[in-house]
UniProtKB/Swiss-Prot annotation:
Any one GO molecular-function label of the UniProt entry: metal ion binding
Modified residues (4-aspartylphosphate): 78
Entry's Gene Ontology cellular component terms: cytoplasm
PANTHER family, sorted: TWO-COMPONENT RESPONSE REGULATOR (PTHR43228), TWO-COMPONENT RESPONSE REGULATOR ARR22 (PTHR43228:SF1)
All residue ranges annotated as the Response regulatory domain in the record: 26-143
InterPro entries: CheY-like_superfamily (IPR011006), Sig_transdc_resp-reg_receiver (IPR001789), ST_Response_Regulator (IPR052048)
Protein name: Chemotaxis protein CheY
Keywords associated with the record: Chemotaxis, Cytoplasm, Flagellar rotation, Magnesium, Metal-binding, Phosphoprotein, Two-component regulatory system
Signal sequence residues: none
Subcellular location: Cytoplasm
SMART domains named in the record: REC
Function per UniProt: Involved in the transmission of sensory signals from the chemoreceptors to the flagellar motors. CheY seems to regulate the clockwise (CW) rotation.
PROSITE patterns: RESPONSE_REGULATORY
Length: 144
C-alpha cells in the first residue's frame, strides 16, 4: 500500500536559493523603486535567497558591490536610475570583477538597452512588470 512517506513533501525540496552546501545565494538588488526592490526581495526570499543589501542607484550599487565583494553571488540591476544608470553601473562592476553575475531588470520597450547590457556582459534580463516564475527561472539559470 502507498503511504504519505512515498511522496516527498514540499518541505523536502531544496529551495532554488540555496547553494549545494545549504548556504543561501546572496543577492544585491539595485533599483531606484522601493516597490520593485521590495517585490524582488519577497520573490527571492520565498525561495531561500538572501537579499544581502539594496541600492537606490548605480553609484550606490557599485559602491555596495565593491564593499561586499566577494560576498555577493548575483546583482539585479535596473536599467533606468538616477545618478548612474544600470548600463554604466554594469560596466563599472565588470571592470572591478569580470566574473560578476548581473541580471538586468528593464521595463517593456527598452529592448535596445537590454541588448546593449547583454553585449557588455549582463548574464540575463527580466522585464517589468515582474513575473515571479520568470524572475526565479532567470536568476537560477545564471547561478547554475
Amino acid at each position: 500500500m502507498i503511504s504519505k512517506q512515498d511522496f516527498p513533501t514540499i518541505n523536502d525540496r531544496v529551495p532554488a536559493g540555496q547553494k549545494p552546501n545549504g548556504a543561501p545565494y546572496r543577492v544585491l538588488v539595485v533599483d531606484d523603486s522601493m516597490f520593485v526592490s521590495k517585490q524582488i526581495g519577497q520573490i527571492l526570499t520565498s525561495e531561500g535567497y538572501e537579499v544581502a543589501d539594496t541600492a537606490v542607484d548605480g553609484v550606490d550599487g557599485v559602491e555596495k558591490y565593491k564593499a561586499m565583494s566577494p560576498g555577493v553571488d548575483l546583482v539585479t540591476m535596473d536599467i533606468t536610475m538616477p545618478k548612474m544608470d544600470g548600463i554604466t553601473a554594469l560596466e563599472k562592476i565588470l571592470e572591478f570583477d569580470k566574473n560578476a553575475k548581473v541580471v538586468i531588470i528593464s521595463a517593456l520597450g527598452k529592448e535596445e538597452l537590454v541588448k546593449k547590457a547583454l553585449l557588455l556582459g549582463a548574464k540575463n534580463y527580466i522585464v517589468k512588470p515582474l513575473d515571479r516564475k520568470k524572475v526565479l527561472e532567470r536568476i537560477a539559470s545564471v547561478l547554475k
